[in-house]
Curated annotation (Swiss-Prot):
GO terms for cellular component: extracellular region. One of its GO terms (biological process) is chitin catabolic process. It is an enzyme of class 3 (hydrolase). It is found in: Secreted, Extracellular space. The active site is at 150 (proton donor). One of its GO terms (molecular function) is endochitinase activity. SUPFAM superfamilies: (Trans)glycosidases (SSF51445). This is Acidic endochitinase. Belongs to the glycosyl hydrolase 18 family. Chitinase class II subfamily. Residues 1-22 form the signal peptide. It comes from Cicer arietinum (Chickpea).
Length: 293
């Protein structure tokens, strides 16, 4: 009989652990404004569960891959290795730190399956669990790779498969498609079912973003995204009007009182993604919403 009584708390513990591991969170992009503070500053807010370092903006088409962290550091002089201890400090707090590929203004493409494999090996050896004498962010081992691909679109499914194939480390994969479904650049990659997190950009796209009190277009697009192969879907929002020139800012009170209640019923709801750390630090957006995410 004693064993029977012990089963119930054990099951409760397992249930709590599962719920905790799938708990919703906030993701943020850091790296595109030298005035946004350090990476560790962002993590020390305790507002974020994911930080995407933006961006590896040059790769493919015979180019040497290169990160561009705006005014934070000069990669050509190994100046970005200073962030290694900050990455490790973030990870020690339980925050997943990923490297984001692409962006809105990069020089990147994948012209063949071979280029996809070559890039995967480069990422593994220079940012993930492999080894290299020239790791741009130092010895810190990142948790995964984010795909913010806003031009081209071929062979990113093969890149995802190659990154997923490194058995020595779980490589978390995330993607940041635009909200019109399916995404013009990342659809084939997302349909592999390999992406742990898909933070959809519900801004700069009038047909599927919040506008003038109307959440219907956003919710309709959200329902399309949650029917995709994504494991978890996040609502991507700008932290201010300045962060989204073509619109989509959802006032924090509207997000918490109207939008989140409408989308959190989905079992694929993962949380909220914020673009970006600089604008969030200025507006206090994550402070205003974190209790409701």
């Amino acid at each position: 009989m004693e064993k029977c009584f012990n089963i119930i708390p054990s099951l409760l513990l397992i249930s709590l652990l599962i719920k905790s591991s799938n708990a919703a969170g906030i993701a943020v992009y850091w790296g595109q404004n030298g005035n946004e503070g350090s990476l560790q500053d962002a993590c020390n807010t305790n507002n974020y569960q994911f930080v995407n370092i933006a961006f590896l903006s040059t790769f493919g088409n015979g180019q040497n891959p290169q990160i561009n962290l705006a005014g934070h550091c000069d990669p050509s002089t190994n100046g970005c290795t200073k962030f290694s201890p900050e990455i490790q400090a973030c990870q020690a707090k339980g925050i997943k730190v990923l490297l984001s590929l692409g962006g809105g203004a990069g020089s990147y493409s994948l012209n063949s399956a071979e280029e996809a494999t070559t890039l995967a090996n480069y990422l593994w050896n220079n940012f993930l669990g492999g080894t290299s004498t020239s790791r741009p962010l130092g010895d810190a081992v990142l948790d995964g790779i984010d795909f913010d691909i806003e031009s081209g679109g071929q062979h990113y499914d093969e890149l995802a498969k190659a990154l997923n194939g490194f058995s020595q480390q779980k490589v978390y994969l995330s993607a940041a498609p635009q909200c019109p479904y399916p995404d013009a650049h990342l659809d084939s990659a997302i349909q592999t079912g390999l992406f742990d997190y898909v933070w959809v950009q519900f801004y700069n796209n009038p047909q599927c973003q919040y506008s003038n009190g109307n959440i219907n277009n956003l919710v309709n697009a959200w329902n399309q995204w949650t029917s995709s192969q994504a494991k978890q879907v996040f609502l991507g929002v700008p932290a201010s009007d300045a962060a989204a020139p073509s619109g989509g800012l959802i006032p924090a009170d509207v997000l918490t009182s109207q939008v989140l209640p409408a989308i959190k019923t989905s079992p694929k709801y993962g949380g909220v993604m914020i673009w970006d750390r600089f604008n969030d630090a200025q507006s206090g957006y994550s402070n205003a919403i974190k209790g409701s995410v």
